[in-house]
Structure formats: C-alpha cells, structure tokens
Curated annotation (Swiss-Prot):
A Pfam family annotated for this UniProt entry: PLU-1
Domain notes: Both the JmjC domain and the JmjN domain are required for enzymatic activity. However ARID and PHD-type 1 domain are not required for activity per se but contributed to recognition of the H3(1-21)K4me2 substrate peptide.
GO cellular component: cytosol; nucleoplasm
Organism taxonomic ancestry: Eukaryota, Metazoa, Chordata, Craniata, Vertebrata
Start-end of Basic residues biased regions: 1428-1441
Zinc finger (C5HC2) in chain: 692-744
Encoding gene, per UniProt annotation: Kdm5b
Catalytic activity: N(6),N(6),N(6)-trimethyl-L-lysyl(4)-[histone H3] + 3 2-oxoglutarate + 3 O2 = L-lysyl(4)-[histone H3] + 3 formaldehyde + 3 succinate + 3 CO2
InterPro entries per the UniProt record, alphabetical: ARID_dom (IPR001606), ARID_dom_sf (IPR036431), JmjC_dom (IPR003347), JmjN (IPR003349), KDM5_C-hel (IPR048615), KDM5B_ARID (IPR047981), KDM5B_PHD1 (IPR047978), KDM5B_PHD3 (IPR047979)
Annotated positions of the Phosphoserine modification: S986, S1328, S1456
Domain JmjN stretches: 32-73
Residues involved in Fe cation binding: H499, E501, H587
GO biological processes: branching involved in mammary gland duct morphogenesis; cellular response to fibroblast growth factor stimulus; cellular response to leukemia inhibitory factor; lens fiber cell differentiation; mammary duct terminal end bud growth; negative regulation of DNA-templated transcription; positive regulation of gene expression; positive regulation of mammary gland epithelial cell proliferation
Designated name of the protein: Lysine-specific demethylase 5B
C-alpha cells in the first residue's frame, strides 16, 4: 500500500495565499493523501487505519481506494426510499457573506420602520457595498472625523474605485443619506432628548424575522452583466427595497433561480403578508422601484379638537401641524425638524418614532438554521431534479461539467450577495428506517452467494462501529450517525459545513454511486486555529451562537483560512472510494452532482484519551454529550476478562485517570458540606434526565441533587449552580463507590499486566538511549514472547516487528557491505551497480544503524568502513588535485577501493587519471629510451592518447608526440627514399643525412637501416682500403665476400665496380682453366684435377661418403687433416700466404705418392701371385678376374674389357689408365703457362690458382728429374731388365684374344704418346690363358727412383715429352738408347751426373723445398709487377728437324723457369737476393730429361712436371704432345719413383 499523495509527518503549514486568486478566483488547496491498500492490508480495516494514521493525521482527512475487485452491491430499495431534503441558500452558508446580509437586513428594517424604501445606489457602474463603506468609515473614526479630515477619497480608493473622479463626494452623499441616520440611531443620539422609552409596552407590529426575507435586495443589473448571473427574488416587493442605479438600465426579468422551485417563506400573519406584497413596476422610464404608492398620512387636516390632542413630544408644541408626524406604533407626535437627524420630508409610508424604532430593532434574532423542503422526494425524483438543475445551470450535460468549474462556481456563489442560489440536500437520512446502502443480514434486498462476503466485511459501515477493535461496540444504545450509518443524497452545490464529529471520533464516508463529492479537511492539531479565525472574521455570528461550529450551518472559503495560516487539504471522492476523517479534524465540502453516500463514526483504542478530553471541552462549551464516556469505560471494565489485552491496558489507564478525578471531586464536595449520598443506576435514566443543568454533561459516575428541585442534577464541577440551598441539604448520587472502582481497575490490570510488562519492555527497548540499547536478539525474543502469549496484533507489536525487520535488513545490508568486494575493477555498460550505496547513502545508513532502537554487531565495523571510505575520499581528492599524480599512487588507491562495495564517485575520475598517468609515464619512458621509440609506438601512444579524457598534460604530450611523429615519419620516408634511390647516393651525402637523423629522439626503421648501411659502407671501404694497403694479394673468397657485402649496401661505393670486375675476371679464368683441363661431362672439379689425389685406393668410396657426409666404414679412422679434397680446399683457403699453400699441397703430394705406391705394389702382387685366389676382386665391378682383361699403368689394377673401354690394336702401344686414374685431358704445358701468366696478371689468390702453380712446379720438377735420369747411365740397366723379358704378366693374352682387341677403339684412358714398335710383338705375354690385353712395365725390375718417376709421370695432369721419352727409353733396345745418347749434346757423364744429382737432391729434398717456400712468399712488388706485365711466351711447336738448335730450346726453357720461379718467389722480401749459384741455375737451366733432344728454335714447347720437382721439360724430350700437355697432367720419372720407397 502506498499513498497516492504522501505528506511528511507533523503539522503542515498553510500555503502563503493572499486570499482568492486573481479576479477572485478560487485556488484549490493541496490534495490529501490517497491510499490504495493491497488485499492483505484491506482485510483488517482497523489495522490498516492504524498503519496510515501517522500520515493521514497530518492532513485531517484521507482517501482510500479499495482493491479494484471490491465492489459491494447497492442494497437500498431505490423506489421505496423517500426523504425530505433541507433547503440551502448558498450565500447564507458562508460566514462573512451572512454577516453582510445581516447588516443589510438591519439597514432595510431601519428604513422600513422609518417609512422609506432602501435604495442601494450604483457608483461607477458598481453596486455600492454599504457594509464595507460603513466598516471603513467606522475604522477611520466616524462620519464627522472623515468629513473633517477629508478622507473620502482615501475610503473610495480602499473600496476599489479609481482616484481622481470625485468618487469620494458621491460616497459621502450616499453615506450621509443612508448610513449616517442609522448610525446615529445606533449611537442613541436620536433618543437623548427623550426619556427612557417604555420597552415593556406591547406593540401590534409583527416581530421581524430577518431570515424570512428571501431577497435582501433587488438589483437592476447593468447592460454589461450577463443575465444568467442576475436575478430577482419572487418576494422582492415584500422587503420594500429599492435600488437606485446611477445610470438608467433596462430592468431584466429573467430569473434563473425561479427554476429552482424555491418555496415562499412562511409568514406568521397572512393578512399582513398580503398587504405588504407589492408589484414591481415595469415602466422603463422610472429608474426607482417604489415600494409604496399610497398617499402619505396627513395630519394637517384633522378637526380642531383632534389637533389639540397632538403635540410634539420633543418640543411640546403643536405648531407646524404639516410637519407633525404621528408614530404608527405608539401614536406619539414629532416634528420632522425636531428629530435627530431632522427629516426634510414627511415619509410616505408607515413611520416609527425613535422610541418604537429602538424597541423594534433591539429584539434578539433567531438562530440560523436550515429549513426543510415542503416536498418529499424519492431517489428517482430527486435525481431528476438534481440533474435538471445542474444541466440548466451550466448549460451542458451533467457528466461533461469539469469538477474544477463546479468548485470555482460554488465558492463564487457562497461569497456573493448579488445572487441567491438555493439547493436541496438529503442529509442525515437514518439507515435504520430506510436501510443501508451496504448489504445486511435479514435485509430486504437478496444477496447472491458470491456477494455474501460483503455482509461481514469490516469495510461494511454497518459492521465497522461494532467490531471488536471499536470501543463504540460497548455502547448498548443505537446512536444514529455514530453506531448506525446515515445516508446522504446530494445534488450539485449541496454542501456540508465545517464541523467535527461528535466526541471527536473518527468518521468514514463511502460514496456508493453518483458524481464526486469534494472534501476539505483541517488537521486536528489546527482545530482551535480554525475556530479562532472564524471568530475573528465573523464575530457577529458567534455573539448569538457560541456553538455555531457545532450546528453545521456555517462555511468559510478555504482560501480565506489558508490566508490566515490554517492548513487545508482537499480531495474529490469518486464512487467506490472511502474518505476517513480523524479525531477533531474539521471537514466540509459539497457535492458535484447527484450522488448517494453513507457515513458512520467509529472509535479506536487510541481515541480514548481524546474522548475524555472532548468531554471536558464539551463541559466548557455547555454542549450535551451523545453518550457518557465514563459509562462506556465502566462497561468495558466490567468485561475485563473478555477484553482484548491492548484494549484492557488502554482502558485501565483511562480508568485510573477517571478514578483520580472522581476521587478529587468527591473530596471537594465533601469539604463543601455535602453529607448525604446514595447509589443510583444512572444508566437506567434517559440521557436528558441525567444531564447537568449547567454544562449539559451526561452524568454517570456521580451527581448532586436537591430536594428543592426534584429531577434536576448537576455534575460535581457545578455544585454551586444547582440552587441556593446550603450544601448540607444536597444529596450525592453515585454509581460506584471508590472501593468498587479499584477492583474493576485491578481486573483490567491483571488482564493487561502481562501485556503491559511486555509492552513496557518493548517501549523501553524502542526508546532506549544509545548506551542502553538492546541487541537484535532481544527484539526477536520479545516478538517470540508475543506470539507465545498470543498478544494482539496491535500497533506496538507491528511497530516492533517493523523495527526488527528493518534491523534485520540493515544487518544483512551491513554484512554485505562488510563482505562485499568489487568483482571487477571496471564495470560494463559503466554506471552504478544497482545494489551499491553511495558514500552519502553509506553515511546515512551508518546514521540509521545508530538510530535503530537495537544494537547491531556490524555497526562499529561499518563505522570503521565508513571512516576508511572517507579517508579514501580525502586521499583521492588530494591526489586528484595534483596536476599530474603518479600512476602507482592512483593504482594503490584504486586497489584500496576494491575493498569497498560502495559507489565511489571518484573512481571514474581516478580511472581516467590513472589511464592518463599511465599513458604519460609510458610516453615519458618511451622518450627516455629514444632508441626503442618506434613510429608504431608513437602511433600507438597517439591512438591511446586520443581515447583519453581531455587533460592539459595529456594534450601537451600529445602535441609533442605528434610533432615528433611528423618529423620522424618525414625523415623515415626520406631515409627510405635515400635507400631506394637509383643511382645510389654517395657515402658522404648519406652520412650527412644520418647525422641529421641522429638528432631525432626516436627509432626510425629506415633511418636505422640507413645508418647501418652507412656504417657498413664505411666498414667496407675500410676493409677495401686495408686490403689494398696491406701489400698482399687478395684471396678470392675475400673478394667475393667484399663484392657480396658491397652489393647489399645501398650506397654508391667507388671501389665496388673494380672489385666486381676483378671477381668476374677470376671466374672467367676458372672457366678457362676448367675448359683446358676437364673433359666434357667430367665428374671431377677443377680443384680435384689440379690438386694431388686424396682418394687413392678407395675406389671413390671416400669421395662418395664425403659427399653424403656419412661416416667411413668400420675400422677406418678419419685423418685429422688433408683426408679429403674438402680438407685440402679448406687448408688452402685458410692459408694466408702462397708458401703455406705450397707446403700444404706438397704434403698432399707426399700422401698421394705414398698411397698410390702402396696401391700399385698391392695390385701388382695380387696379379702376379702364383696361386690363383678365387676370392680375388678386380676391376670396377670388384669381381674375380676373367679374360680378356686390361691393366692400368698407374694403379696396376686389372679391369675387364667388358667393364671398361679397352684400347684397340692400333692404340695398344699407348699407356692405358683406368677411369679412376684418368682424371683430366692432360693438356700440354704450353697451354697451361698462359693460364699462370693471366692469373699473375689478375693478382688474386684462389685455391685453384695455388693448385695450378704447384702443379706446374711439380711438373717442372718431374721434368728435371726425368731429364737427369734420361741423361744418366743408370737407365741402361733398367732398359736391359725390361728388354730381357724378366718381367712378364701372369695372364698373357692369346693371339686370338689379342686380335679381338683390335676392334676396340681407343679408350679415354690411353696416353697420347706411342710405345716402341716391338712393344706389341713380344710373345712372352701370349701364352697365358688370361691376358690383360695391355701390358705394363714391371715394378719389381725397376729401381725406386725410376718407379717413382714413372708413377708420378702418370699422376701429372700435363702431357710432357719426357714421359714418352722415358717409356721409349725403357722399352726400346739398347742400340736405340745408345743412338739417342749419341744424338745428345756432348757432356761428360760425371758432369751430368753431378748436375743431375745436385738438382735432384735440391728438388727431391722435402726439407729444402719446405724451407725455400716461405722465402718465396716475400717476393717484392716490383718483381710481381714485372711478372704481371710480362707477356706469356707463345708455345711453339717442337721442331724435331733442328735438333742441334739448343740455344732456342734453352731460351724457351729459361722463360718457363722464370715464370715458375716468379710465381714461387713473389712473396720473398725485397731485400732477399738470389745466390749466384741459383742465378746461374736459372740461366743455365736445361731440360732435365735424361735423353734431352736439345731442340732449338723459337717454337720449342715446354712442359712442367706435376710432381714434386716442378721442373720444366721439353715436350719432345719427355714424349708429350701438345694435346696431351694441354689436357693431361705430366709427372716426370724422378717424381714418379722418388716417393714410392718413402711411402712403403
């Protein structure tokens, strides 16, 4: 249940209204509370009223709307209900209007008795307000003072007339003519010259009844006034009132009020009535309405005797008979000029002398009251009349008239004297006689079963007064209006005046149906204030009627009351709604139209103190009581055992007061001397027979009587008012003795004792101070006690429950606040959680906890929480006041706030400031480490900053960051364009740009790349400069790395094109070298061919495993160095000097020679073994031997002719090498020397170049050794051994098989030189069942030197003539050898041997060679330049036709030696000089072949030994053709046999 209008408790001050609104409009007061109870609340009306009483008492009235489904049937018989309504003249209801009308009645009566007609004048087209004029003149001091002080203009202004129009003089004339005589009469000036009049004489004039005059004035309206608001009374003539308009206007005869059927007032004398009714003149030319057209009474024409009888009572003279007036009341005579004031003319009507006038006017007026209508109505006929009146009055259907319009019109009508509206009101119709509108049991209207619930409903007004909770139920008498409902049938404007209920009881009114009823209410605390205001504003009414407000006949405008600070509230009661008035609350109102209402009184337990107070108030006003309050209390006390404990407790308290008052009064009476007393059952007497004759109080407890006045009683308060007898003659009548009363009170006390104790405990708990408050558990215990002892569900218990429930809710909320944690730091959506309290609410909640009647354990904890929250607010406010707070401090405060489940308004700003602080700190940190401040970081920070709330520091940082980003993007884009520029920018320009970019405190990706590029370029230039300045020949890998680096640097490098050209030349040289040495589709690389072999004896297994990076077979251990070609290549690349590279290659040669020698002897022994080994594996296929087979000259292994390409018969004289040993084309030396010269010209070191130099040196060395061998005599023994046939093959070939080989073409393994002609005619090889098809020189018959020399001859990848010469020498007859010896130059054997021996020792000595190679590295630069610019001599073909031309041959050989020596000694220091012996050796260098042919001429071709000696040989001397010298390696005989013994 919630009231539609809620008001704060306590007195509500009146609105500061200054009266009615503009133009006199009515301003409605504020609305009273409107309650809409739920079904649960509506079930108990008294409990609900108790619940709303604190609110509704403050307004005096309230409205209750039942639940929508609560619709009781209307139980009245509409056709049988009939009543006689009251007549209500609206302008007689309002107090101030009635005072004005009474004044006009007196003025009219005065002039009527003076024989004149009252004429109300018009001033400024307005009717002159005589009442206001008379009052203002009196306030200013009277007529004489106003005239003396000339205040008429001031009075005219106060009356609302415009100044400056001489209105004051007009008003003065009207006052002097109409009001001044009346005031002189009232002051007694007209009677001062007379003796005291005899007022006891009877008069024949009829007593004047003011309220019998229905019309005080007949108004001639102005032309501008609407006719609907101007009317004439039916009996205006009877009042003899004329209106004197200031301007002639047409008399309007339209009278709206005639339709009302107003009854004619009842006159006591019909004859007088007939003689006094005059007809209104209808002539328009006469502006005055004459009430008297008879001739004036004339005294002048009487007889002489009669004239002598009439003399002036004032002057005693009978003169001036024509001025002598005769009183129509007492027949006294007065001169017109002797009267005060004097009369200028003889009145035309009946005239009364001052004495009779005073006697007539001093008669007391009758009390005002309503008249009963002459007609009896039923509901139907009354409704027809009421609807017709409202419809005609407002000229529209009744249901379309707004309630506001009716309300304003009502208050206008009650305040005007110009219009009289009469309505009728069917009020106070007894429901006992005609039946209630609610259904009752045994009623005349049958009720359906579904409507039977309304029979026993507490809201049925027949049940409410007699319910158990109502104390009126203990009154046995049926009091109409209080215990029995009254019915009210209203029409438009019918009203009920200001009043309070009898005994200040409650009242409840239910509007069954019809149009609304408008109510006005004043709270009970302002009742006396209202009474005082009405007495102040209309004191004349209270002179004759002190209890005027109890008569329900007076109303006053609510605006007037509110102007005097009386609180007034209103409401419109619609059909089906209740209006409840509270004790001593004045209320009034009117009906909006035809309706039917029912009302009754009721009294609750809380009313009992007010009821006793009301009786005391009635005693002071001498107002009778409706029932005896003490009688009701005693009746309730006599039933103490069945009373409700709450009622018993309240009655016990009231009874205690009653006993104390009775005890004191009886003691006072005893002291007065009253002795006799007797018991009397007052309840058996009618109420009018036991009233105090003084104060009208109904006596019950006691009374005083006297034998002198039997039947009369006085209460103990008015003992002295009974009679004049002495008190000892009085008799005290009492109902109970004091001893009877105490047991009755004790019975109530016993009944209520347990409850009282409980209630006392409850009250103490509810009203306890802070330090004495009880716990919530104690409150729950009190509730449990009430339930256990079945105490009634009254206000106290409900209040206790409500307080306990509130405390429990508070405890629950407090616990939630104490336990509550914020679930997230930042909420969605934003805003406030619906369950969170603000800090102010928390503060109020803590205050509420301390204001609770009980103590909660959470209160101090919550107070501490509040203190912490307030501390948090202070700290946050302090922190937020700083220009730039720390993010850590903000976060710390926010972390603290997570403990508070409270809405903190600072959190939003703190989160905003935290984001700002974090952002600023991130910006600051990023700016401090400018090297990591990237463009993306700046953009991200700017994007984050854009999303932040506006703040000065943020905006400044944003501006700086945006400026930095703009500059950074500009320079980054510029750096990007510089990097992508074509052609590329120079290093200096880019360095300048980098220097400028370094001043930007940010990380620029392209700028960093540019800076890195500039640094790389500087490093590159530095490396290039260091390479050029070092004096060393650059290594190819270094050049390639420099070129690759230079190409990757986006900077224009001046040296890069030169290096690229140099690298290109090197690659071109390598391609040329590869074409020279490698056959097509060769599986060997150039480096493999040029370097000593590393895969000897493994049949390529090592190489394959090296390519697959797989481990060697088990049992094989990997060598630490030079194990493979990659090791050798790596060693060459790592060598910094040429001498180191030569040493590495020399070591590789020694390993090669040792491995190959071992392999040769192993294969030879395998093939020459006398026992045939079935497990012997030969050939590439590693299978057993099978004819025909061919033997490799170098590795000495046998190969199936089906597995390899065997040489044909025509090629059988040539040396055959297997696929493993045949590695290159073995070009002649003349084709290799240009490669070396071009390499020296290029001045770049590369592994292939080092290998080529070593190969040439090895070739020359081998040539030298071979020539020494050929020139020595040691070769003859070897020749004899080979020629004697000591060496034979194990598998000689048959003739047939040999011939079969003729069809085989020459394989690529055959050498280019030819053996002697008888080589293939030897028969020693043809008797074996197996034949190799190609025989080799035997190994066992050769010396190690020869064997090594032959072996190295095949290892050399150069074709040399010494190889052919050596083989020819070994395989030819001795005669051929001798012939060859003869054809050689003349040289002693000792000299040749010495020379050859010396050279052989120098070449073949590894220690000496390794010692000399580092010395050769220091070759001075001038020699390098000489070698570089030296043109390589063109190879000349050998001219065998000039064998004697030794000079040319020696010159060509010397040139070859110079090239080799220059390459070997380019690293020698500049101060190193050759010895004379070495110089002479270079100058006298000859072909070291044993059988040198000493060719002469410019076209002598040389070939260098590829072995370890590196000696140069004539191609023709060693049997190497130019093609072989170009495609194949050449190893001299000495190198072939030298290393064999050392590797065994």
């Amino acid at each position: 249940m919630e009231p539609a209008t809620t008001l704060p408790p306590g007195p509500r001050p009146a609105l500061p209204l200054g009266g009615p609104g503009p133009l006199g409009e009515f301003l409605p007061p504020p609305e009273c509370p409107v309650f809409e109870p739920s079904w649960e609340e509506f079930a108990d009306p008294f409990a609900f009223i108790h619940k709303i009483r604190p609110i509704a008492e403050q307004t005096g009235i309230c409205k209750v709307r039942p639940p929508p489904d609560w619709q009781p049937p209307f139980a009245c018989d509409v056709d049988k209900l009939h009543f006689t309504p009251r007549i209500q003249r609206l302008n007689e209801l309002e107090a101030q209007t009635r005072v004005k009308l009474n004044f006009l009645d007196q003025i009219a009566k005065y002039w009527e008795l003076q024989g004149s007609t009252l004429k109300i004048p018009h001033v400024e087209r307005k009717i002159l307000d005589l009442f206001q004029l008379n009052k203002l003149v009196a306030e200013e001091g009277g007529f004489a003072v106003v005239c003396k002080d000339r205040k008429w203009t001031k009075i005219a202004t106060k009356m609302g007339f415009a100044p400056g129009k001489a209105v004051g003089s007009h008003i003065r004339g009207h006052y002097e003519r109409i009001l001044n005589p009346y005031n002189l009469f009232l002051s007694g000036d007209s009677l001062r010259c007379l003796q005291k009049p005899n007022l006891t004489s009877d008069t024949k004039d009829k007593e004047y009844k003011p309220h019998d005059i229905p019309q005080r004035q007949s108004v001639q309206p102005a032309e501008t006034c609407p006719p609907a608001r101007r009317a004439k009374r039916m009996r205006a003539e009877a009042m003899n009132i004329k209106i004197e308009p200031e301007e002639a206007t047409e008399a309007r005869t339209h009278n709206l009020r005639r339709r009302m059927g107003c009854t004619t007032p009842k006159w006591e004398n019909e004859k007088e009535m007939k003689s006094t009714i005059k007809q209104e003149p209808t002539e328009k030319k006469d502006c005055e309405l004459e009430s008297e057209k008879e001739k004036p009474k004339s005294r002048a024409k009487k007889t002489a005797t009669a004239v002598d009888l009439y003399v002036c009572l004032l002057c005693g003279s009978g003169n001036d008979e024509d001025r002598l007036l005769l009183c129509d009341g007492c027949d006294d005579s007065y001169h017109t000029f002797c009267l005060v004031p004097p009369l200028h003319d003889v009145p035309k009507g009946d005239w009364r002398c001052p004495k009779c006038l005073a006697q007539e006017c001093n008669k007391p007026q009758e009390a005002f009251g309503f008249e009963q209508a002459a007609r009896d109505y039923t509901l139907r006929t009354f409704g027809e009349m009421a609807d017709a009146f409202k419809s005609d009055y407002f000229n529209m259907p009744v249901h379309m008239v707004p309630t506001e319009l009716v309300e304003k019109e009502f208050w206008r009508l009650v305040s005007t004297i110009e219009e009289d509206v009469t309505v009728e009101y069917g009020a106070d119709i007894a429901s006992k006689e005609f039946g209630s509108g609610f259904p009752v049991r045994d009623g005349k209207i049958k009720i359906s079963p579904e409507e039977e619930e309304y029979l026993d409903s507490g809201w049925n007004l027949n049940n409410m007064p007699v319910m158990e909770q109502s104390v009126l139920a203990h009154i046995t008498a049926d009091i109409c209006g209080m215990k029995l409902p009254w019915l009210y049938v209203g029409m438009c404007f019918s009203s009920f005046c200001w009043h309070i209920e009898d005994h200040w009881s409650y009242s409840i009114n239910y509007l069954h149906w019809g149009e609304p009823k408008t109510w006005y209410g004043v709270p009970g605390y302002a009742a006396e204030q209202l009474e005082n205001v009405m007495k102040k504003l209309a004191p004349e009414l209270f002179v004759s009627q002190p209890d005027l407000l109890h008569q329900l006949v007076t109303i006053m405008n609510p605006n007037t009351l509110m102007t005097h600070e009386v609180p007034v509230y209103r409401t419109n009661q619609c059909a089906g709604e209740f209006v409840i008035t509270f004790p001593r609350a004045y209320h009034s109102g009117f009906n909006q139209g035809f309706n039917f209402a029912e009302a009754v009184n009721f009294c609750t337990v809380d009313w009992l103190p007010l009821g006793r107070q009301c009786v005391e108030h009635y005693r002071l006003l001498h107002r009778y009581c409706v029932f005896s309050h003490d009688e009701m209390i005693c009746k309730m006390a006599s039933k103490a055992d069945v009373l409700d404990v709450v009622v018993a407790s309240t009655v016990q308290k009231d009874m205690a007061i009653m006993i104390e008052d009775e005890k004191a009064l009886r003691e006072t009476v005893r002291k007065l001397g009253v002795i006799d007393s007797e018991r009397m059952d007052f309840e058996l007497l009618p109420d009018d027979e036991r009233q105090c004759i003084k104060c009208k109080t109904t006596c019950f407890m006691s009374a005083i009587s006297c034998s002198c006045k039997p039947g009369l009683l006085v209460c103990l308060h008015h003992v002295k008012e009974l009679c004049s007898c002495p008190p000892y003659k009085y008799n005290l009548r009492y109902r109970y003795t004091l001893d009877d009363l105490y047991p009755m009170m004790n019975a109530l006390k016993l009944r209520a004792e347990s409850y009282n104790e409980w209630a006392l405990n409850v009250n103490e708990a509810l009203e306890a101070k802070i330090n004495k408050k009880k716990s919530l558990v104690s409150f729950k215990a009190l509730i449990e006690e009430s339930e256990m002892k079945k105490f009634p569900d009254n206000d106290l218990l409900r209040h206790l429950r409500l307080v306990t429930q509130d405390a429990e809710k508070c405890a629950s909320v407090a616990q939630q606040l104490l336990n509550g944690k914020r679930q997230t730091r930042y909420r969605s959506g934003g805003g406030k959680s619906q369950n969170q309290l603000t800090v102010n609410e928390l503060r109020q909640f803590v205050t509420q906890l301390y204001a609770l009647p009980c103590v909660l354990s959470q209160t101090p904890l919550l107070k501490d929480l509040l203190n912490r929250v307030e501390d948090f607010q202070q700290q946050s406010q302090k922190l937020l006041s700083e220009e730039m707070p720390s993010a850590a401090e903000l976060q710390e405060l926010l972390d603290v706030s997570f403990e508070f489940d409270v809405e903190l308004p600072q959190l939003t700003e703190m989160r905003i400031r935290l984001e700002q602080a974090r952002w600023l700190e991130e910006v600051q940190q990023a700016c401090l480490d400018s090297s990591s401040l990237s463009l993306d970081d700046m953009r991200r920070l700017i994007d984050l900053g854009v999303g932040l709330a506006p703040y000065s520091a943020v905006e400044k940082a944003m501006a700086r960051l945006q400026e930095l980003l703009t500059v950074s993007e500009h320079w980054d884009d510029k750096a990007k364009s510089l990097l992508r520029a074509r052609p590329r920018h120079s290093l200096s320009s880019l360095a300048t740009a980098v220097k400028e970019m370094e001043e930007i405190p940010a990380y620029l990706p392209n700028g960093t790349v540019l800076k890195d590029s500039v640094q790389r370029a500087r490093d590159w230039v530095q490396d290039v400069d260091a390479l050029q300045a070092g004096g060393r020949v650059p290594v190819l890998e270094t050049l390639i790395e420099l070129v690759a680096r230079g190409r990757s640097i986006p900077v224009h490098l001046n040296s890069l094109p030169r290096l690229e050209m140099l690298v290109a030349e090197v690659h071109a040289w390598k391609e040329c070298a590869a074409k020279t040495f490698l056959p097509e589709n060769s599986t060997y690389s150039l480096l493999e061919v040029l370097c000593p072999r590393c895969d000897i004896g493994l049949l390529g297994l090592k190489r394959k495993q090296r390519k697959l990076k797989e481990p060697l077979p088990s049992g094989k251990k990997r060598s630490t160095k030079l194990e493979s070609l990659s090791d050798l290549e790596r060693a060459l690349m790592e060598s910094k000097e040429t001498a180191a590279a030569m040493a590495t290659l020399g070591e590789a040669r020694l390993r090669e020679m040792e491995a190959l020698q071992s392999l040769r002897f192993a294969n030879e022994e395998k093939l020459l073994s006398p026992v045939q080994d079935l497990e012997m594996k030969v050939c590439l296929c590693q299978k057993t031997p099978a004819t025909p087979m061919i033997q490799c000259e170098l590795c000495r292994d046998a190969f199936h002719t089906s597995c390899v390409a065997a040489p044909s018969i025509s090629q059988s004289s040539r040396i055959w090498l297997c696929p493993h040993c045949r590695r290159s084309e073995k070009p002649p030396l003349e084709k290799i020397l240009p490669l070396l010269a071009s390499l020296q010209r290029i001045r770049v070191r590369l592994p292939e170049g080092d290998a080529l130099r070593y190969m040439i040196e090895r070739t020359v060395n081998w040539q030298h050794r071979a020539q020494q061998l050929l020139s020595s005599g040691n070769l003859k023994l070897v020749q004899d051994q080979v020629g004697s046939g000591l060496l034979s093959s194990r598998w000689p070939a048959s003739a047939g098989q040999a011939s079969a080989t003729d069809k085989v073409s020459q394989p690529p393994g055959t050498t280019s030189f030819s053996l002697p002609d008888d080589w293939d005619n030897r028969t020693s090889y043809l008797h074996s069942p197996f034949s190799t098809g190609q025989s080799c020189l035997p190994l066992h018959g050769l010396s190690p030197e020869v064997n090594e020399l032959l072996m190295e001859a095949q290892l050399l990848q150069v074709s040399l003539p010494e190889i052919q010469e050596l083989y020819q020498t070994l395989l030819t007859k001795p005669s051929s050898v001798q012939q060859a010896d003869r054809s050689s130059p003349v040289r002693s054997s000792s000299e040749k041997n010495d020379c050859l021996r010396g050279k052989r020792d120098a070449i073949n000595s590894p220690e000496r060679k390794l010692k000399r190679r580092p010395e050769r590295e220091g070759l001075p630069s001038e020699r390098w330049d000489r070698v570089k610019h030296m043109r390589t001599p063109q190879k000349k073909k050998i001219k065998l036709s000039h064998p004697k031309d030794m000079d040319s041959f020696k010159l060509e050989r010397e040139r070859s030696y110079d090239l080799v020596r220059n390459a070997e000694t380019h690293s020698l220091p500049s101060d190193t000089s050759y010895s004379e012996q070495e110089d002479s050796e270079d100058e006298d260098a000859i072909c070291p072949a044993v059988s040198c042919l000493q060719p002469e001429g410019d076209e002598v071709d040389w070939v260098q030994c590829d072995g370890s000696c590196n000696q140069w040989f004539h191609q023709v001397c060693v049997g190497v053709s130019p093609e072989m010298a170009e495609k194949e390696d050449y190893i001299c005989v000495r190198c072939t046999g030298k290393d064999a013994p050392s590797r065994k």
